Each structure stands twice: as C-alpha cells, then as structure tokens.
C-alpha cells in the first residue's frame, strides 16, 4: 500500500500536480471491525458481560438474564468504559471512542493531509481513536512534508 501511495505521489509530482505550499489536514473517526461486547479488562481478562454480572449480583439479583444486564447497563449511573482498563483482544489497537452520532464503539482515527492548491492527498495516517487532533496533527504534517520532500 505504501509503495502504491509513493508511486501516485511521484506521478503527481511529474505532472506538476503538487504545489506543496499550503496543506490542509482533516480527520474523522471510523468504527473498527471489532465488537464492544468482546472487550475484556486489561488487568484480569474479565469480559464486560462478567463485569456487569458481578455488579448486578452485588446490586440486586443473583442470576441476571441478558435482558436484565442490558437494562442495568443502560441505567447505570457514572458508567465509564476506559481505554486504560479495557481492550478488545481480537483488535487491541482499536480504541473505545464516542462516534459523531453519540454512540460508543471501538474505532480508529484516519487523518489525511491535502495539497490545498491541487487537492492531492499528500499524507494518509491511521491513529488511535482516543488521540485528539492536537496529539496527531504534527505527526501528520511531518509525514506530509517528508512525502513531499521525497518526490520533489
């Protein structure tokens, strides 16, 4: 993939379709192909379902059903699922994140830099979804500068 990206950048440079003077950066959040219901605690490997069952047993019922747990989880005060405590063992790089529609999913943060004169993408990076724009912006700009320097 990287070789294809470099090949395209070289073709754009050969045809003078890169100005490299003004670059814009944009990011988004995309849902990972990993289910929240598969997350486990980092410290002991306990599943989210097991965690909820333990809370429910302490709170009100010895053998909660799946429907009981879903209702309990939805109504639970102060609920917070942290990347510090939880991960998906099948996709450990996916991070718990709030999506634009307000739902919580495992996700990634794609970020790209575009030559604003020509519209050419000069860098495309994937970051952890729990990193804000200020944490990733400089890295994406540095990669864009490196890519432009390689083809100039």
Which positions does each model-derived feature cover?
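Polybasic low-complexity intrinsically disordered regions
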Residues: 1-152
